[in-house]
């Protein structure tokens, strides 16, 4: 029996809880993890990243089977799950850790992401501020952040969380 060949995709699109939830049940996605990428501090804590002094973005790293879901499809979902025209914010979350960014793991991914960015520019009225950058090091966030919204479903999901349940 042959082992499944997997690839990684890393997306910053605001709060990593919502981004992870958007990808978690996608067919072909094997695993998701939330963490930090793009900064200058090794293994930063959530508090450090939120201070705005580390340069990291909150990201979701997706491990996927390219025979079941293509990188192109994952990038298309990226455009659908957030507003790529908002600079350093998504909704009420403000700060450069919430920036819109695609971190690529290969030259092929970089080419696909850039081409997708050009196509997306034709679909949005306002200028897109998303950057495409090479992945330089993913730091997994604290365990309580992993599958955060899924863990809260027993307590009424996101609505329950917002209502203090």
Describe the predicted segments one by one:
Residues 1-165:
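Flexible coil/turn and secondary-structure edge motifs
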């Amino acid at each position: 029996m042959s082992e499944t060949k997997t690839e990684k995709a890393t997306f910053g699109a605001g709060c990593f809880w919502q981004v992870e939830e958007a990808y978690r049940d996608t067919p072909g996605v094997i695993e998701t993890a939330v963490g930090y990428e793009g900064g200058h501090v090794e293994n930063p804590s959530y508090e450090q990243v939120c201070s705005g002094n580390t340069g990291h973005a909150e990201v979701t790293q997706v491990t996927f089977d390219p025979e079941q879901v293509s990188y192109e499809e994952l990038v298309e979902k990226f455009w659908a799950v957030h507003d790529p025209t908002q600079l350093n914010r998504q909704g009420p979350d403000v700060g450069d850790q919430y920036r819109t960014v695609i971190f690529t793991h290969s030259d092929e991914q970089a080419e696909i992401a850039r081409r997708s960015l050009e196509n997306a520019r034709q679909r949005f009225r306002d200028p897109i501020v998303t950057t495409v950058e090479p992945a330089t090091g993913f730091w997994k966030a604290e365990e309580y952040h992993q599958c955060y919204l899924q863990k809260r479903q027993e307590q009424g999901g996101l609505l329950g969380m917002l209502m203090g349940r």
